[in-house]
C-alpha cells in the first residue's frame, strides 16, 4: 500500500464513501437538466424581444419619458419604452418602424403628435401598445385601433376625429382625450368601465347618458362643450374627484349631491346661481366660479380643505363665509362689489389675493397675512398702504390705478418686492 495521500484537487471515487456518491449523482444530473431547460426556454421559448432603438432613432423617433395613465411622468421603468416622433416623420417611416416594435417584450408608448400621419393601419400589429398620442394630426379614421386591447391611454386632441365607434371594444382604456374634436356621440364609451380620465373639452357633446355607468371615472373635463345643459347622468359617478364644467350651459348642479369625494370643481362662465350642493363636498380643494351668476357663498362655510377659490366677476357683495377657511392659499375676488375684507384677517396661509377693480378701501385686515406673495390692488380706492410694510414675503404688488400714498417708503421697506405702480 502506498504511503502517498490522495490528491485533494483530483479526488476519485475511492476518496468518497460509496453511498454518498451514488445519492449525489442523480441530484446533480437533475439540476443540470433543469438549468439547461431554463436556458433553452429563455433563448427560444418566446419570440418577444427588445426593440432596436438605434434603428428607430434613424427612422425619426426620439426616446422619451414613460407616463402614467393621466399623462404625468412615470418613474423610470425598464418594462416601458416611450418614443416621440419628429414632426417630419412620414407614414412610410412609421411602417418601417413597426417590425422593430411588434412582439416587443416591453410596453410601447408612441407619441406621434404634430406629425402628418393620417393612416393608422401600420399600428395594427403593435399588440403591446400601451399609450398613443395623436395630438394635432389629420387622423380621422380610428378603425385600425379597434383590436388594440392593451391600449390604456389615447390622446386625440385637435384631430379630425368625429366618429369614435371603433373604440367601443377597448375595455382596458383608462385615459381618453377628445379635446377640441368634432365628436358629439359618446355611445362607444358605454362599456369602457375602466376609464379614469376623460377629456371632452370643446367638443360637440350634448348627451352625457353614456357616461352614467363609468364607476371608476375620477376626472371629467367638459369645459367649452357649450351644448351641455343637463348633467343628471353624472349623479352616480361617485368616484369623481375633478369636474370641469366651465363655459357650459348648466344652471344647476343639484345632480352632484352624492359626489362627496369631489376635490376640484370648475364652473366658470356658466349661468349657475345656486351652489348649495357643495355643502356636501367636504374634500373640495379647488372651486372656480368666475363669471357665474353666484351671489351667495354661505354654502362654503364648512369647506375647511379649500385652498383655491375663484370668485372673480360674480355677483357677491360679502365674503363673511370665508373667515374660517384657514386652508385658503389663493383667492380671486376681482371685478366684484366687495368692500369689506375683514373676514380674511385670520387666513394665515393665504399666498395670493386678487382684489382688482373691487370697492375695497381699507386693507388693515392684511397686516398679519405674512405668507402673502402676490397682492393685486389695481383700480381700487385704496390709499393707505403702510400696513403692507411688514409683508416681507411679498414678491409682487400691483397698485396701478390707485391713489396709494407713500409708495417710495413701501419700496424701501420691501426691497425684494416687484411693485407695479
Residue ranges and their predicted role:
Residues 45-65:
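Ser/Thr/Pro/Gly-rich low-complexity linker/stalk segments immediately outside membranes or between
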Residues 4-21:
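Juxtamembrane low-complexity tails/linkers enriched in Ser/Thr-Pro and polybasic
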Amino acid at each position: 500500500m502506498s504511503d502517498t495521500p490522495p490528491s485533494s484537487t483530483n479526488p476519485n471515487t475511492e476518496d468518497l464513501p460509496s453511498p454518498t456518491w451514488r445519492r449525489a449523482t442523480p441530484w446533480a444530473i437533475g439540476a443540470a437538466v433543469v438549468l439547461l431547460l431554463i436556458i433553452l426556454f429563455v433563448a427560444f421559448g418566446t419570440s418577444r424581444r427588445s426593440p432596436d432603438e438605434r434603428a428607430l432613432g434613424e427612422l425619426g423617433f426620439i426616446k422619451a419619458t414613460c407616463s402614467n395613465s393621466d399623462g404625468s411622468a412615470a418613474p423610470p421603468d425598464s418594462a416601458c419604452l416611450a418614443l416621440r416622433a419628429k414632426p417630419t416623420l412620414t407614414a412610410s417611416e412609421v411602417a418601417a418602424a413597426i417590425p422593430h416594435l411588434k412582439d416587443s417584450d416591453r410596453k410601447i408608448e408612441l407619441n406621434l403628435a404634430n406629425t402628418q400621419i393620417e393612416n393608422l393601419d401600420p399600428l395594427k400589429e403593435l399588440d403591446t401598445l400601451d399609450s398613443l398620442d395623436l395630438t394635432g394630426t389629420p387622423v380621422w379614421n380610428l378603425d385600425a385601433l379597434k383590436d388594440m386591447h392593451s391600449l390604456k391611454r389615447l390622446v386625440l386632441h385637435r384631430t379630425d376625429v368625429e366618429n369614435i365607434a371603433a373604440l367601443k371594444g377597448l375595455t382596458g382604456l383608462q385615459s381618453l382625450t377628445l379635446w377640441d374634436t368634432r365628436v358629439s356621440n359618446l355611445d362607444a364609451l358605454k362599456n369602457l368601465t375602466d376609464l379614469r380620465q376623460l377629456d371632452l373639452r370643446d367638443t360637440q357633446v350634448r348627451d352625457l347618458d353614456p357616461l352614467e355607468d363609468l364607476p371608476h371615472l375620477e376626472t371629467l373635463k367638459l369645459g367649452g362643450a357649450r351644448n351641455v345643459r343637463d348633467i343628471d347622468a353624472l349623479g352616480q359617478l361617485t368616484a369623481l374627484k375633478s369636474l370641469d364644467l366651465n363655459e357650459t350651459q348648466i344652471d344647476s348642479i343639484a345632480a352632484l349631491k352624492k359626489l362627496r369625494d369631489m376635490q376640484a370643481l370648475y364652473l366658470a362662465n356658466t349661468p349657475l346661481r345656486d351652489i348649495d350642493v357643495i355643502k356636501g363636498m367636504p374634500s373640495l380643494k379647488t372651486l372656480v366660479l368666475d363669471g357665474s351668476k353666484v351671489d351667495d357663498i354661505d354654502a362654503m362655510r364648512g369647506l375647511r380643505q379649500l385652498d383655491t377659490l375663484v370668485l372673480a366677476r360674480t355677483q357677491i357683495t360679502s365674503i363673511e363665509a370665508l373667515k374660517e377657511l384657514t386652508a385658503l392659499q389663493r383667492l380671486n375676488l376681482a371685478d366684484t362689489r366687495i368692500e369689506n375684507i375683514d373676514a380674511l384677517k385670520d387666513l394665515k396661509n393665504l399666498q395670493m389675493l386678487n382684489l382688482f377693480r373691487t370697492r375695497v378701501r381699507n386693507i388693515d385686515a392684511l397686516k398679519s397675512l405674512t405668507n402673502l406673495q402676490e397682492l393685486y390692488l389695481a383700480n381700487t380706492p385704496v390709499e393707505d398702504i403702510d400696513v403692507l410694510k411688514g409683508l416681507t414675503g411679498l414678491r409682487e404688488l400691483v397698485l396701478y390705478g390707485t391713489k396709494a400714498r407713500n409708495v417710495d417708503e413701501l419700496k424701501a421697506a420691501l426691497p425684494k418686492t416687484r411693485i407695479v405702480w
